């Protein structure tokens, strides 16, 4: 967890936060007009990015997801619920890189690529788990504030997040991983 704070000492990681936030916000904003629960969540195919950027860029991907979601909220859903969205989206990017290595034994190849069936299954499992954690946090916060019932919001956000990651995640990982690695931008190479 320390890397979440120490990453700010690395210029490349700070740039990756800005890049990730910009890409996430720029792809979230156009779907603001497709609400599922008006004022709280909408159809979000862009939710693929926290999983992919979290796994590739580590803590920079997590911070980028949080900031990108907050920027998106300025375009129609900004309010006290945005605090829950900030934290929930942080975890959407944080959990993929934190959980990835826990699925592999010592000495096993833990490169964040989907080059084996096991890695694909692990990626898909992480997408579902991170989606649920994000949804629980956001739904709990909004229920605490009295905005939306927990069960309804948690179910919608979990499915919405997971669908984007399950369908688009493997495609983006296969396309981006080789390039990110070649450019030396994997978080494990920077920090």
Where are these regions (language model features)?
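Hydrophobic transmembrane alpha-helices
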Residues: 2-63
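Membrane-embedded alpha-helical hairpins and interfacial helices in multi-pass inner-membrane proteins
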Residues: 29-48, 71-191
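Central hydrophobic cores of alpha-helical transmembrane segments
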Residues: 62-72
């Amino acid at each position: 967890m320390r890397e979440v704070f120490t990453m700010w000492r690395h210029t490349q990681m700070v740039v990756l936060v800005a890049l990730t936030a910009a890409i996430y916000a720029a792809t979230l904003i156009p779907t603001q007009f497709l609400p599922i629960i008006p004022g709280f969540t909408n159809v979000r195919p862009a939710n693929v990015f926290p999983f992919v950027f979290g796994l590739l860029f580590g803590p920079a991907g997590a911070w980028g997801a949080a900031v990108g979601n907050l920027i998106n909220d300025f375009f129609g859903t900004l309010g006290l619920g945005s605090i829950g969205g900030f934290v929930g989206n942080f975890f959407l990017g944080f959990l993929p890189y934190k959980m990835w290595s826990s699925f592999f034994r010592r000495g096993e190849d833990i490169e964040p690529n989907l080059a084996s069936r096991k890695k694909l299954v692990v990626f898909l499992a992480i997408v579902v788990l991170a989606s649920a954690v994000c949804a629980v946090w956001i739904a709990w916060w909004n229920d605490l504030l009295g905005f939306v019932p927990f069960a309804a919001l948690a179910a919608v956000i979990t499915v919405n997040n997971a669908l984007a990651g399950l369908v688009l995640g493997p495609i983006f990982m296969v396309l981006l991983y080789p390039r990110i690695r070649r450019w030396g931008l994997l978080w494990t190479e920077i920090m």
